[in-house]
Amino acid sequence: MAAQRTYLAIDLKSFYASVECVDRHLDPLTTNLVVADASRTEKTICLAVSPSLKAYKIPGRARLFEAVQRVREVNAQRLQTAIRQNKAVRGEDGKYHFASTSFDANALNTDPALGLSYIVAPPRMQRYLDVSTQIYKTYLKYVSPADIYPYSIDEVFIDVTGYLPYYHMSAHDLAMTMVREVLYNTGITATAGIGTNLYLAKLAMDIVAKHIPADKDGVRIAELDEQSYRYLLWNHRPLTDFWMTGPGTVKRLEAHGIYTMGDLARFSIHGEDRLYEVFGVDAEILIDHAWGYEPCGMEQIKSYKPSTNSISEGQVLTCPYPNDKAKLIVREMAEILMFRLTEKKLVTESITLEIGYDRENVDKG
């Protein structure tokens, strides 16, 4: 039997927004900020929302106008509170106003006379890549590149099995040491999950850590093994919180009366064949994950190569385009794809075009 391994999953908290706050010498945990290109109208997507602004129920991938609308709603409630407490200011027009506004969560929490404001920071992708590289180099001070898998610009998996006896540390202590150094060097807070496999490390970070108190720096570290996973998460809902379980999969599971991972595990005991009928080879992954198993380790995910290649090109237009202009955009994107195929020495047998329509114009017919 193979020795049990220990994995870390580390996620940089609201990474793009945190970088923008730090570069402005502001606290990423208490500064209200969105990363969005306001020049592309309020329909542009927010690439990141700071934690304090998320606390007002603004999702991380909201459209800018949705953030504007939610802030307006919050300020309407705050103004009523300020009026009741005789802290609002009556202007020359006879209407009540806030005495001032603030984008700092601490100030807003202590003074109801302040209106909620926020910073709109234009995205700077090269800057985010530079900071991500700096943080990756911090991890390399503790582990070998062979034991790190960058999952995204702000998230990594690390196999720390062999390092725990070397450093005479627990997984929690090693995770905290690395996260603390990232915070010290960059000002960016991270969340970590510890698991006996990659899947459990990811869930510890994504789900369990969100429900434990943060330390004074906003750091959260959670741990899972197979037994604690079943105890803590078999009844957790919604299923979409679980890694690699999307809305389409969840809809098909619910059609079979499966609403939790515990339901799925129990169903698999006698209904395994039915799961394979519905999900094909993906049923194996679903069943493994329901029980807290994950057979792939660091070596397998680093050596994985897809059986097929795909490349894509996309644009978010700043306003509705008529047919002739849209045709020009599509032609330009097709030419870019052609050049990229040539560079990679690839050919294709399939081209897919997806077009999203402006909601207002669709409603108008």
Mark where each language-model region is:
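Gly/Gly-Pro- and Ser/Thr-rich, intrinsically disordered tail segments characteristic of DNA damage-repair
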Residues: 1-288, 296-298
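DNA-contacting surface of Y-family translesion DNA polymerases
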Residues: 9, 241, 249-365
